[in-house]
């Protein structure tokens, strides 16, 4: 299940943590944009998402500043390719920024002409996996047209991180449900699948019913603060297994320090928290 990525190491001084945390922290789910378009991109995305506030400037440098201040040891950029033909430029930009502590996934669009070629390029560039967003990319994870992507990622041992559940910037019906991710994991048992937003944003009852216990990872991004019943978070973690839950923020849409505090304040054991904040990501990406 876990892949090896040689050559990753902790940067000097990054092991230092703030007083409220004695744990190493890796954020598997952040977003950055080129400096020239970061401000306009955040303004556009916020406007279409009920004026959702942002907590960084959306640039690599500002994310680094906030992350180190909050005690993070590392973080993952998750670019979304929103149009066919963009993958080459997006992935080249991401690869230029894929250096510890700031790692990066790559991206592919379901309508790209050479899907397998794009996925191979992501591997050849040394990127850490592939990010997908069924709403922004308008596809369902079980559609036959994306099957070659899953097959190739499984073959090349590239983890995939997929948006889960509803999206504040879109209207229903949504493209994929927790049961679809469960089926995807059944079809591709060797594929490392990470479902964002604890398996399905605002679909957490369905996550408990259809996805908990399956061969997938769940990330915590943009989830806990929206859950009316906080005990459901703990219940999902315990039933699914803390060894299959990864810490994420969806930065710039969540304050980095607050996100750590939200998760660390839950009634989980120290070992469970260490798995979520660091150990599980370290096993996947071998750092």
Where are these regions (language model features)?
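Active-site neighborhood of phospho(di)ester-bond hydrolases with catalytic His/Asp-centered motifs
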Residues: 25-28, 78, 105-106, 131, ...
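Conserved, mostly hydrophobic/aromatic
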Residues: 29, 94, 130, 153, ...
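A general structural detector for well-ordered alpha-helical segments in enzyme core domains, enriched
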Residues: 62-66, 90-97, 117-122, 145-149, ...
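Mid-to-C-terminal alpha-helical segments outside catalytic/metal-binding sites
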Residues: 4-7, 19-31, 35-70, 74, ...
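Active-site gating/metal-coordination segments in enzymes
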Residues: 20, 73-74, 84-168, 172-175
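Active-site environment of divalent metal-dependent phosphoester hydrolases
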Residues: 33-36, 82-85, 111-114, 137, ...
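Catalytic pocket-lining loop regions of alpha/beta-barrel enzymes
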Residues: 128-129, 142-246
């Amino acid at each position: 299940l876990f892949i090896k990525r040689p050559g990753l190491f902790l940067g000097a001084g990054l092991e230092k943590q703030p007083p409220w945390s004695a744990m190493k922290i890796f954020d598997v789910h952040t977003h950055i944009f080129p400096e020239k378009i970061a401000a306009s991109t955040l303004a556009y995305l916020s406007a279409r998402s009920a004026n959702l506030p942002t907590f960084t400037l959306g640039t690599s440098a500002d994310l680094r500043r906030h992350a180190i201040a909050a005690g993070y040891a590392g973080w993952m950029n998750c670019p979304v390719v929103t149009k066919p033909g963009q993958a080459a430029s997006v992935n080249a930009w991401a690869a230029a920024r894929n250096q510890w502590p700031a790692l990066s996934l790559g991206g592919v669009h379901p309508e790209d002409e050479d899907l397998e070629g794009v996925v191979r390029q992501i591997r050849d560039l040394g990127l850490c996996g592939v990010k997908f967003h069924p709403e922004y990319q308008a596809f369902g994870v079980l559609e036959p047209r994306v099957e070659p992507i899953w097959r190739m990622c499984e073959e090349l041992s590239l983890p995939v991180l997929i948006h889960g559940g509803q999206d504040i910037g879109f209207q229903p019906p949504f493209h994929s449900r927790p049961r679809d991710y469960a089926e995807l994991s059944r079809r591709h048992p060797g594929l490392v699948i990470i479902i964002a937003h604890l398996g399905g944003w605002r679909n957490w009852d369905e996550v408990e019913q259809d996805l908990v216990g399956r061969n997938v990872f769940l990330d915590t991004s943009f989830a806990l603060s929206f859950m009316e019943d906080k005990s459901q978070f703990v219940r999902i973690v315990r039933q699914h297994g803390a060894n299959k839950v990864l810490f994420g923020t969806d930065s710039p849409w969540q304050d980095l320090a607050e996100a750590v505090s939200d998760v660390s304040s839950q009634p989980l054991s120290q070992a469970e928290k260490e798995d979520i904040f660091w150990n599980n990501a370290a096993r996947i990406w071998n750092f």
